[in-house]
Structure formats: structure tokens, C-alpha cells
From Swiss-Prot:
Annotated metabolic or biological route of this protein: Phospholipid metabolism; phosphatidylethanolamine biosynthesis; phosphatidylethanolamine from CDP-diacylglycerol: step 2/2
Assembly behavior: Heterodimer of a large membrane-associated beta subunit and a small pyruvoyl-containing alpha subunit.
Positions annotated as active site in the UniProt record: 90, 147, 254
Example GO biological process: phosphatidylethanolamine biosynthetic process
GO MF annotations, alphabetized: phosphatidylserine decarboxylase activity
Bilayer topology annotation: Peripheral membrane protein
EC number: 4.1.1.65
Protein name in UniProt: Phosphatidylserine decarboxylase proenzyme
Keyword Lipid biosynthesis: yes
Organism: Escherichia coli O7:K1 (strain IAI39 / ExPEC)
Main enzyme class: lyase
PTM note: Is synthesized initially as an inactive proenzyme. Formation of the active enzyme involves a self-maturation process in which the active site pyruvoyl group is generated from an internal serine residue via an autocatalytic post-translational modification. Two non-identical subunits are generated from the proenzyme in this reaction, and the pyruvate is formed at the N-terminus of the alpha chain, which is derived from the carboxyl end of the proenzyme.
Residues modified to Pyruvic acid (Ser): 254
InterPro entries for this protein: PS_Dcarbxylase, PSD-B, PSD_type1_pro
């Protein structure tokens, strides 16, 4: 009965306005009130603040600052084996497995369309038919920055407007085509393991979705699909990210979907639905063997990442939109 009531609310409540209100409130500096809200949130969701770079809740000027708090480097070590892809987010695996032609498993008895997830982009969908997928759910208590499973060169980003259903286990089991209906940002990378898509899915009360190379992608919510492309390799203007490096973030919780090309990776055997994930832990293993490099490449300094994030050049210049 309670679950039926919760599902009914998903269709009745004004999700867009609730999301706008939450985003507005979370961005406000309210002094002692902000600290009180953060303290209550930490207590209710049992957030482990010892992992944060700033464990004192009084150090956060807004709720959003707290929500996207960076962690101490040593608490999420990255697996350095060049044959291993790592978890992109802290959370719980909702579903994982093989993409059956155009079908991706959402929950038991529920599939959705790969092509619909990719906003009808059949050329991109062709890269992943019969490939592998992993869906990771980020709960409110989790760290909400998203990282790279492997080295990658960004080739394309697509913003897809949509609904703002919650993306928890209840809605995944009961709302048809959930991830292909919700607002999302699709990021396509060239990697050593073939093409990889990392998709950031919005939800109710997700105030914004951001990337380190373009800043805030949504809001504004203009109701139109937007597309950006980048050059390959070392060409001017290319965007290269390293394994374990931050690539985006949510302001309030949501879901990350990873798509891998067929025959390129095998998921780690012990992973299953509801497995807990931590950034940097093994996610998949290459079907080919790579030689360990003599030296690991150095990631971009944190301050450079923040500078790129704050600049938001692509949000201001939308000449490549379609």
C-alpha cells in the first residue's frame, strides 16, 4: 500500500517545480540554518564525514557545497592495473549485464531501448548493440562526483530533456522506460577498450548535472536536445581525461549508466545487482592484455579541474547545438 502511494506521487507531484525549489534552496547561504540542515542530513542518512576533505559541516556555505564535497585522495585508491576499468561512482549497482540487441535490463521484467536511451541516435546505438552495460544508483548519502572508469578522449556530449522521476529501486521496478524517459547527459569517449558511453541521469530534486569540461549542463531546462562534439586525439580543443579523474557531478542523487562495446570488456565476476560500489574498485577487465606503462600519467591538478568546471565555456557558447 505504501509503495503504491509513493508511486502515485511520482505521477501527481509537480516534479519540475520541486526540483527548481530544491535547487534554489540548496544554493542559498543561510548561515546557521544551512549548518542545521546539513547536520540533520548527515545524521539521517549516516553520511561518513571522516572521508571528506572538510569534515566540519560548518565549513560549507551552502547545502550544494556540502553535497558535492570532495573526498580525501587516500579514501578512494584507484586500481592501477591497465587492464582493469574501475567503478565510476559510489553507490549500488541497480542492474548490469549484456545488452541484448537494443534491449537493456532496467529491473526484473522491465527492459528499455538502447536507442531510446541515446535519444534516437542509431549510429551511437550501433556501437553498443550486444555490448555490456552497468547501471549505478547514487543514494542521498553517497559521494556525488562521478569519475572515469579508464582513460578516455571525449568525442560527443548530448543533453536530452525529459521527465524527473525518482530513480530509486522502487521506481526502477515500476516505471516503464525510466532511464530513457528522464533528463540525462550522454558523454561518449574513445578509450583503449573501444567506445564508452557514460550517461548521467537526472531525477526529482536533482538541482543540476555538471561536467568538468563544460560546467553546468542543466539547468536551464529548455526542452530541446543539445549536442556538442570534440576532436580526436591530441588535436587542438580535445578533452582527455585519465582513469579515476572526476568527469562530472550531481547536485542531489541520481544514476550513472555505462555502456561498453561488444567483446571489449568482461564485468568482474562477483558483481551483481545490489552490489555496493566505491570509486576506484574493479568494475571490468579488458578482453585484451595491455602492457603496464613505465610511469603513470599525472592527473590534472584539482585546482585546474575546478577552474575548467567554473568557466563553463560550452554552456555559454552553444553554436554546436542541434
Amino acid at each position: 500500500m505504501l509503495n503504491s502511494f509513493k508511486l502515485s506521487l511520482q505521477y501527481i507531484l509537480p516534479k519540475l517545480w520541486l526540483t527548481r525549489l530544491a535547487g534554489w534552496g540548496a544554493s542559498k547561504r543561510a548561515g546557521w540554518l544551512t549548518k542545521l540542515v546539513i547536520d540533520l542530513f548527515v545524521k539521517y542518512y549516516k553520511v561518513d564525514m571522516k572521508e571528506a576533505q572538510k569534515p566540519d559541516t560548518a565549513s560549507y556555505r551552502t547545502f550544494n557545497e556540502f553535497f558535492v564535497r570532495p573526498l580525501r585522495d587516500e579514501v578512494r585508491p584507484i586500481d592501477t592495473d591497465p587492464n582493469v576499468l574501475v567503478m565510476p561512482a559510489d553507490g549500488v549497482i541497480s542492474q548490469l549485464g549484456k545488452i541484448e540487441e537494443d534491449k537493456i535490463l532496467q529491473a526484473k521484467g522491465h527492459n528499455y531501448s538502447l536507442e531510446a536511451l541515446l535519444a534516437g541516435n542509431y549510429l551511437m546505438a550501433d556501437l553498443f548493440r550486444n555490448g555490456t552495460f552497468v547501471t549505478t544508483y547514487l543514494s542521498p548519502r553517497d559521494y556525488h562526483r562521478v569519475h572515469m572508469p579508464c582513460n578516455g578522449i571525449l568525442r560527443e556530449m548530448i543533453y536530452v530533456p525529459g521527465d524527473l522521476f525518482s530513480v530509486n529501486h522502487l521506481t526502477a521496478q515500476n516505471v516503464p522506460n525510466l532511464f530513457a524517459r528522464n533528463e540525462r547527459v550522454i558523454c561518449l569517449f574513445d578509450t583503449e577498450f573501444g567506445p564508452m558511453a557514460q550517461i548521467l541521469v537526472g531525477a526529482t530534486i536533482v538541482g543540476s548535472i555538471e561536467t568538468v569540461w563544460a560546467g553546468t549542463i542543466t539547468p536551464p531546462r529548455e526542452g530541446i536536445i543539445k549536442r556538442w562534439t570534440w576532436p580526436a586525439g591530441e588535436n587542438d580543443g580535445s578533452v582527455a581525461l585519465l582513469k579515476g579523474q572526476e568527469m562530472g557531478r550531481f547536485k542531489l542523487g541520481s544514476t550513472v549508466i555505462n555502456l561498453f562495446a561488444p567483446g571489449k570488456v568482461n564485468l568482474v565476476e562477483q558483481l551483481e545487482s545490489l552490489s555496493v560500489t566505491k570509486i576506484g574498485q574493479p568494475l571490468a577487465v579488458s578482453t585484451e592484455t595491455f602492457v603496464t606503462p613505465d610511469a603513470e600519467p599525472s592527473p590534472l591538478p584539482a585546482e585546474e579541474i575546478e577552474a575548467e568546471h567554473d568557466a563553463s565555456p560550452l554552456v555559454d557558447d552553444k553554436k554546436d547545438q542541434v
